[in-house]
Amino acid sequence: MAKAKFERTKPHVNIGTIGHVDHGKTTLTAAITKVLAGKGQAEFKAFDQIDNAPEERERGITIATAHVEYETDKRHYAHVDCPGHADYVKNMITGAAQMDGAILVVSAADGPMPQTREHILLARQVGVPYIVVFLNKADMVDDEELLELVELEIRELLSSYDFPGDDIPIIKGSALKALEGDTGELGEQAIMKLMEAVDSYIPEPVRAIDKPFLMPVEDVFSISGRGTVATGRVERGIVKVGEEVEIVGMKATAKTTVTGVEMFRKLLDEGRAGDNIGALLRGVKREDIERGQVLAKPGSITPHTKFKAEAYILTKEEGGRHTPFFNGYRPQFYFRTTDVTGIVELAAGTEMVMPGDNVAVTVNLITPIAMDEGLRFAIREGGRTVGAGVVSSIIE
């Protein structure tokens, strides 16, 4: 069969499978492609094709991730599945695979397990906004009451991490049956039901271009007779010539007006998300603005120094530290375009952090940086990446 060309007319959503080892994440991923391939909406990917995912490098961290794509009547999906638990942790923290929603796979025979909890916590910390549950291996549980208890337990667990446990769709089924071609209630029908739940429960993400304007400053030039130009890649939103913007981070926030936008030496009316632009700024001196600051829509982002974060610390093999670090550790935090020194505070009861750990920390930066929740950063020592993190909440 020739590769079907995916129509880009449908809205695009990024999702992934999460959950405890051996609860059936990869089998479910394969089953979704199998069932949708039957409707001409996917290319079937066998379990082994997904399980032997190639390794990718994201910010110097090696992550094994499988990517599959498929579509429903309503949408086009990109779906990520990771073979190992450590890969999930790294993936979610680095944002290598940004998820608009996740399918939490729980084995009906076992109920929630330690990694089920950890993945829900990570989803909460790194800002995966919506979760749909697939209660897998339901054919292995004969007792209807037992199934109801497991469902109740999952709902309580989700609620305890601030997800709306009572409202989250839980679909019972057997990924293996569906993969083997079973057309019954727990087989193919369960997969179709799951996709309907994903379609209706996970909302369409707000596209980068629809968010308030933000551009990290990469470089600054003076153009004699014209003024100061800040260059960078527009991270989100649109900036039009004549609009007011704020310069945020590192110093007191200042307002200015964009009097020109250029790209590839051509003058434009506006710069949009994804564009590499130079923005000419009115009344700004060369020394008023520097790399590491951002240009942003006024009032849309503020500078902060203290925040809570979820971080993954690289192993020695990944090029990270060879030794643990302790409370008061002072590395550099690389936000967008610049390194800022910060002091790490470990949670009470945590003595030290070993290479390969993922950990919740509080960070105090020595200079304020424009940030909001969900912002990713690298942890570096003298230019070498030793960790990756994401801002989970801002303190001050």
UniProtKB/Swiss-Prot annotation:
EC number of this enzyme: 3.6.5.3
SUPFAM superfamilies given in the database record: EF-Tu/eEF-1alpha/eIF2-gamma C-terminal domain, P-loop containing nucleoside triphosphate hydrolases, Translation proteins
UniProt region (G3), positions on chain: 81-84
CDD domains: EF_Tu, EFTU_II, EFTU_III
Cell compartment(s), UniProt: Cytoplasm
Residue ranges of the region described as G2: 60-64
Keyword Lipid metabolism: no
Record-linked InterPro entries: EF-Tu_GTP-bd, EF-Tu_GTPase, EFTu-like_2, EFTU_2, G_TR_CS, P-loop_NTPase, Small_GTP-bd, T_Tr_GTP-bd_dom
Catalytic reaction equation(s): GTP + H2O = GDP + phosphate + H(+)
Identification of the protein by name: Elongation factor Tu
Organism, as annotated: Geotalea uraniireducens (strain Rf4) (Geobacter uraniireducens)
Gene behind the chain: tuf1
